[in-house]
């Protein structure tokens, strides 16, 4: 039996909507990365972009466990000497929760050129409203462990 290689025409993309209310950020990111890569499909191929579109709503209500709100820091650099700046996740979630969710998911995608294509299928929104109702997204439930 020969190995099946999917053709670009064989890719069937679906839309999923995930409610991030009280979901631990790491669990949300890992399951979203699986959907974006397409690893949940039986026709998965690591060299192709097989993933689905993912909409995440209520990003401002995502949860972090332990003392990560105060101790975990997000870093960025301006490109100039001495241009390293950092902010803790309590401030980041208050000012820009979309960035915190995108950063966590981006870290769980492969560090290849496919990651940019897969990340472009991610839509994150601060509140409960999103403009993708025409795509008829299916609700995806995150398997949650009691905190």
UniProtKB/Swiss-Prot annotation:
SUPFAM superfamilies in the record: Ribosomal protein L13
The UniProt record lists the keyword Ribonucleoprotein: yes
GO cellular component terms, A-Z: cytosolic large ribosomal subunit
Domain of life: Bacteria
GO terms for biological process, alphabetical: negative regulation of translation; translation
Claim: Ribosomal protein is one of the keywords in the record: yes
CDD domains named in the record: Ribosomal_L13 (cd00392)
Cysteine-cysteine disulfides: none
GO molecular function: mRNA binding; structural constituent of ribosome
InterPro entries linked: Ribosomal_uL13, Ribosomal_uL13_bac-type, Ribosomal_uL13_sf
Family annotation (NCBIfam families): rplM_bact
Chain's role: This protein is one of the early assembly proteins of the 50S ribosomal subunit, although it is not seen to bind rRNA by itself. It is important during the early stages of 50S assembly.
Homology family: Belongs to the universal ribosomal protein uL13 family.
Quaternary data: Part of the 50S ribosomal subunit.
Protein name: Large ribosomal subunit protein uL13
Organism of this sequence: Renibacterium salmoninarum (strain ATCC 33209 / DSM 20767 / JCM 11484 / NBRC 15589 / NCIMB 2235)
């Amino acid at each position: 039996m020969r190995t099946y290689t999917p053709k670009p025409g064989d890719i069937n993309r679906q839309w999923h909507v995930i409610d991030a209310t009280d979901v631990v950020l790491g669990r949300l990111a890992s399951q979203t990365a699986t959907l974006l890569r397409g690893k949940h499909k039986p026709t998965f191929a690591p060299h192709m972009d097989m993933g689905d579109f993912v909409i995440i709503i209520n990003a401002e209500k995502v949860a972090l466990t332990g003392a990560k709100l105060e101790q975990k820091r997000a870093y960025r650099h301006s490109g100039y000497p001495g241009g390293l700046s950092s902010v803790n996740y309590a401030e980041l979630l208050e000012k820009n929760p979309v960035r915190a969710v995108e950063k966590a998911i981006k870290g769980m995608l492969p560090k290849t050129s496919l990651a940019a294509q897969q990340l472009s299928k991610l839509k994150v929104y601060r509140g409960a409203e999103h403009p993708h109702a025409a795509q008829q997204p299916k609700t995806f439930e995150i398997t949650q462990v009691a905190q």
